[in-house]
Curated annotation (Swiss-Prot):
This is Ribonuclease Z. It holds the Pfam family Lactamase_B. Binds 2 Zn(2+) ions. Zn(2+) 1 binds at H63, H65, H141, D212. SUPFAM superfamilies: Metallo-hydrolase/oxidoreductase (SSF56281). HAMAP family: RNase_Z_BN. The active site is at D67 (proton acceptor). The gene is rnz.
Length: 312
């Protein structure tokens, strides 16, 4: 599991940062890639990575401002040229379906695969797919805006080899059933419960994506215990009044959420073009004083999210 940042800027593209998009790579888990927001030129950014559009199966849109959606029509069109691609689902606020369909209609673009739309309105579970759940809640922005929490199911514990050795169980169907936590009957009539031969479950990973918003209480439960929190940081920590007026957040506000909600790593994202070089470093340093495990991400940065308990 890995995050790759395709656009980390705010409002408009700059030479240093494209507008918003981040890819959640679930290649080992699902052989899929999920995108969160698709700002203008996202598909150009993808050309500079190893991402293949045929692997993109879900797109989550936080809100309908142009710097988060203007890349959608072109990306969807290009995906049609990738051969035999499967269906794609777009999750987003009311209006996202109209935006896509009108853009494709006016440009007379034909899509070779089904697109399903899930328009968001209420907080809660919006997606469940083979061991992953995605939850959403409203944020506080000028227009309807949503944050996302991706939760991986727990994994079975490790097989207790020493305990199995007591019963002289060889490799084969019986061992396979025990690994799956099933009950089995031995030749002598002994009943073994696979759950007794597995260590504690390994908790799944949690990724939280927060785009445009003021500091608001709904972020807390979306971010709770996240392995990685990607949080907008449009303003510096000493500009909270300006951030509030423009319906955005500061680096320090993001760091306070990370500390409060037991987050493991904070990625500052959605960086205004006013912050370059030393000024960008200032945002990161301000946040680190509150939450040390903070990084300010740049376009094409990759963040690995290892299994809990992994030494990687």
């Amino acid at each position: 599991m890995e995050l790759q940042f395709l656009g980390t800027g705010a409002g408009q593209p700059s030479k240093q940062r494209n507008v918003s998009s981040v890819a959640l790579k679930l290649l080992d888990e699902l052989n899929e890639i999920w995108l969160f927001d698709v700002g203008e030129a996202t598909q150009h950014q993808i050309l500079r990575t190893n991402i293949r559009l045929r692997k993109v199966t879900k797109i989550f849109i936080s809100h309908n401002h142009g710097d988060h959606i203007f890349g959608l029509p072109g990306l969807l069109s290009t995906r049609s040229f990738q051969g035999d691609v499967g269906p794609l689902t777009i999750y987003g606020p009311a209006g996202i379906e109209d935006f896509v369909k009108i853009s494709l209609k006016v440009s007379r673009t034909k899509i070779s695969y089904p697109i399903h739309y899930v328009e968001l309105s209420e907080p809660g579970l919006i997606c469940e797919d083979r061991g992953f759940k995605v939850y959403t809640d409203r944020l506080d922005h000028r227009i309807p805006s949503f944050g996302f929490r991706v939760v991986e199911d727990s994994h079975p514990g490790e097989l207790l080899i020493d305990k199995l050795a007591e019963y002289n169980i060889p490799n084969g169907p019986i061992l396979g059933k025990l690994k799956n936590g099933e009950q089995v009957a031995l030749a002598d009539g002994t009943i073994l419960d696979g759950k007794d031969f597995l260590g504690p479950e390994k908790p799944g990973r949690i990724i939280t994506i927060i785009y445009d918003t003021r500091s608001t209480s709904s972020i807390a439960h979306l971010a709770k215990d996240a392995d990685v929190l990607v949080h907008e940081s449009t303003f510096a920590g000493d500009e909270s009044k300006m951030a509030h007026n423009y319906y955005h957040s500061t680096s320090v506000q993001a760091a306070k959420i990370a500390r409060q909600e037991n987050v493991k790593q904070l990625c500052l994202n959605h960086i205004s073009a006013r912050y370059m070089g030393a000024k960008a470093k200032k945002l990161e340093n301000q946040a680190k004083k509150v939450f040390p495990n903070t990084i300010l991400v740049n376009d094409f940065d990759r963040v690995n999210i290892p299994m809990k308990g992994s030494k990687k």
